[in-house]
């Protein structure tokens, strides 16, 4: 290994120490029995949602509860989170009034289907009357957090005294963990082949309580322009015109490397065999036809650290990387080797990856979340997850778009001396739910909120209002709503960190 390569790898290690915030460390996993592990094989995203306080008229049977007594849902949508200030200001206090509106549950007649349809999300209005107790005007920067993925990103709308304001978007990192593929017995260590989404509001408490997760989101993006990359670009692959019975001719690149000194990332490859003990790796891709979207696109092997050795390229009659697959005569590809850097090549790859496709956020934000996922869990860290062992950048980018994260909208307001203004946040809130459950618990949906988590804004009063629209039956809650008695607005206590509401349709 050359001194230059050693310096590169030292730089990579140093870079990750600085970039990877403790908040990115996967949360500690609870041990699962065999049945739970087997269930994880079929469902990559597992979740838990909130609470249990049955009201009069509620069901006697209840879904499985977590360790804290929370009702366990397989998909947890995350809580409604409170507004905070970029910099704490003792002159500013707030009165918070949150409304949970079940208007989307009202059936709407579909003429084409000849039936009523409805959604199971709700509308949330989270209003803050900000009061300035100081003797001078206060210019403050507001941050409003919300839980989402880029795939399902719908930005909340912020208004100040009724007028919509412009906002800037900040994205947090992956909020979940990783888990094995299943089949583990109690006490066995799991793997990291699957994503394991946040399971409860406590996961968000652990994520947000010390402020480091937010600080990372507000900070500057990692700079990897100083990481040198040796690029192997594969272009113009071809197969014989007469393929015979060969339906999937494939190009394979086989090479040797020292896994302790070299990292390989790829774009366009979709078959891989790696063997750290023997120091060998094989990467492959199907030769595209003209009708396919990747026809004419380059394929990349990106080598970081010490260069690979003994590269051989050949054509094979089928996909995969089985050693006994026969070779196919008449195949070929142009391979060009050149030097670049990780920033340039990642931008090149992501530009090609998103060509003609919307990414929900601008390119710089998209680039950043993919890079942070790669640096935290991909091949550039000693804590690499087996999910990314192939080095395929498509996997990292796909996860970066699909994983759940906390995001923030930022805006600036001026609260006059001795005066007040009202900031209102309006958004849709998805339900927490089960993919499958017994008949008695079918149709159960959960919604929850937290009062102070991650916020430095002093709320002198918090209230919650339920607009049930006559559509729901309350099963479990700790708000204190009573539909029969007409109690639909309640005062929340700051000492109660977490409030939850579990319902189903009134006519179910």
What are the residue ranges of the model-derived segments?
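Intrinsically disordered, low-complexity segments enriched in Ser/Pro/Gly/Ala and basic residues
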Residues: 1-4, 42, 64
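Disordered, charged N-terminal biogenesis/targeting segments of membrane/secreted proteins
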Residues: 1-30
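A broadly tuned, weak detector of single residues within folded domains
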Residues: 5, 32-37, 121, 457
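Generic detector of low-complexity/intrinsically disordered segments
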Residues: 17, 26, 46, 57-58
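Internal signal-anchor transmembrane helix that establishes type II topology
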Residues: 28-54
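Lumenal/extracellular ectodomains and adaptor appendage modules
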Residues: 52-508
